[in-house]
């Protein structure tokens, strides 16, 4: 991906030199032409087309933002209730992510959502130990993480 971005920027600057007009609009036009060339050369350049990865990163950010808002609402409900009836619990989350950076990213995203914190990762990197402030059932918690955060983290790391 980094090579594709670099090639795109070099071709954009080359476009400025060829046209002789050094303004922002001309750079954007050159960037778009270079983007087309990078797309055509995607078989030669390593990795998948970088705009797909950028799209997946934006999707990851939006999914995390939605999960963050939902978790904040849940924690607010717990805090403003007059009686305390939440059930905090520890549970083990089994992940099938293989790359270390994906596991770390997933762990950080889980920790950043209010009401959950990652306590550790097993040595074989298949289990994440989590504390939840309001635990319903393990199946619900696991499905919530697997269907949202882990899914988009896996998509970002596919076909690098």
UniProtKB/Swiss-Prot annotation:
Coarse class of the protein's main subcellular location: membrane
UniProt-annotated location(s): Cell membrane
Superkingdom per UniProt: Bacteria
GO CC, one annotated term: plasma membrane
Pfam families: MNHE (PF01899)
Oligomer status and interactors: May form a heterooligomeric complex that consists of seven subunits: mnhA1, mnhB1, mnhC1, mnhD1, mnhE1, mnhF1 and mnhG1.
Function: Mnh complex is a Na(+)/H(+) antiporter involved in Na(+) excretion.
Protein name: Na(+)/H(+) antiporter subunit E1
């Amino acid at each position: 991906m980094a090579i594709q971005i670099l090639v795109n920027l070099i071709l954009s600057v080359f476009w400025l030199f060829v046209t002789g007009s050094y303004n922002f609009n001309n750079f954007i036009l050159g960037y778009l032409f270079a983007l087309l060339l990078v797309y055509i050369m995607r078989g030669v350049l390593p990795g998948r087309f970088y705009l797909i990865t950028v799209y997946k990163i934006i999707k990851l950010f939006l999914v995390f933002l939605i999960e963050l808002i939902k978790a904040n609402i849940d924690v607010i409900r717990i805090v403003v209730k007059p009686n305390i009836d939440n059930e905090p619990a520890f549970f083990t989350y089994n992940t099938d992510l293989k790359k270390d950076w994906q596991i770390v990213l997933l762990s950080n995203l889980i920790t950043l959502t209010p009401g959950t914190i990652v306590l550790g990762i097993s040595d074989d990197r298949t289990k994440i130990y989590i504390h939840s402030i309001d635990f319903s059932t393990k199946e619900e918690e696991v499905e919530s993480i697997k269907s949202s955060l882990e899914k988009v983290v896996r998509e970002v790391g596919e076909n690098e």
